[in-house]
From Swiss-Prot:
Highest taxon of source: Bacteria
Gene responsible for this protein: hisE
Species per Swiss-Prot/TrEMBL record: Pseudomonas savastanoi pv. phaseolicola (strain 1448A / Race 6)
Subcellular location: Cytoplasm
Pfam families: PRA-PH
Protein name listed in UniProt: Phosphoribosyl-ATP pyrophosphatase
Zinc recorded as keyword: no
NAD among keywords: no
Family the entry assigns: Belongs to the PRA-PH family.
Broad class of where this protein is predominantly found: cytoplasm
Length: 110
């Protein structure tokens, strides 16, 4: 995992037991999973809108910014569920060399 993701995962984990007013992430944890999921949904929509705008303008700066927000809130969700981002990277590694059609068929068969 990249240093950036590792460092972020450590920070997110450290915020779990912090006072709600000590940081944005701590406040999300205290508000609960539904609030985290609400933020994740908002960031998903903002990323989609930024991508549509970038397709017209050719400027992807907002897509990068919104994708960072999306990844960040995805990592907050994973941490809230007791999962580490390495699990996602491991899943992506597992998929290398596996065609998308085969991977989807394997999921459907389960």
């Amino acid at each position: 995992m990249t240093d950036t993701l590792s460092r972020l995962a450590e920070v997110l984990e450290s915020r779990k037991d912090a006072a709600a007013d000590s940081s944005y992430v701590a406040s999300l944890y205290h508000k609960g999973l539904n609030k985290i999921l609400e933020k994740l949904g908002e960031e998903s929509i903002e990323t989609i809108i930024a991508a549509k705008d970038a397709a017209v303008s050719g400027d992807c700066s907002d897509v990068i910014y919104e994708t960072a927000d999306l990844w960040f809130h995805s990592m907050v969700m994973l941490a809230a569920l007791g999962q580490h981002p390495q699990a996602v990277l491991d899943e992506l590694d597992r998929r290398f060399g596996l065609s998308g059609h085969a991977e989807k068929a394997a999921r459907t068969a389960e």
